[in-house]
Amino acid sequence: VVRTRLQARYFDTADQRLAADGMVLRLRKEGRRWVQTVKATGDNALHRLEHNVDLGATGGASPAIDPQRHQGTPVGDRLAKALAASGDAPLVERQSTDIVRLTRDVRVTGAGGAVVEMALDVGKVVAHAGTPDECESPVCELELELKRGDVQGLVSLAHRWSQQHGLWFSTVSKAERGVRLLAKLEVVPAVKAQTPRFP
């Protein structure tokens, strides 16, 4: 089991243009290294576009956010369009997270011989930091990611763990939790579900 402290800062325009477009732009300290990431919704709830830029160790100081680091990638182009549509409004820190992550690779027996990374995240999401409106929400989630093999191995492992440990499936990201905190929403309005499409 590998233990890592993850401290992330999430950026958006003041009117939350990126969130409205299903995008997240963050700087995250992973141990001693900084990584800038942009994510966007994909074709379905299980598919996300993502691009990471390793910024290395910066002597403890947080580097400045720079959307240009993602230029020339599909999600970077989408980010550039969203920012241009906002009139190139400045990016501001909207929320942050402080998480301890425990990771382990699990080999799933059976057809396909899948290897799944299990990541247990425990910590908090904070919105309005340093203001009278500061609020936080606890995080305790288990993320499963297929590293190689058949997706059925991942589904089988998720089903087994949900049955044995009372877990439930959620597509709500830490960034979305922060957006809900900013809006003072416990839950979002219900939407009609669509049949999932698996790759």
Locations of regions flagged by a protein language model:
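Phosphate-end processing signature that detects enzymes handling 5′-triphosphorylated RNA
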Residues: V1-P199
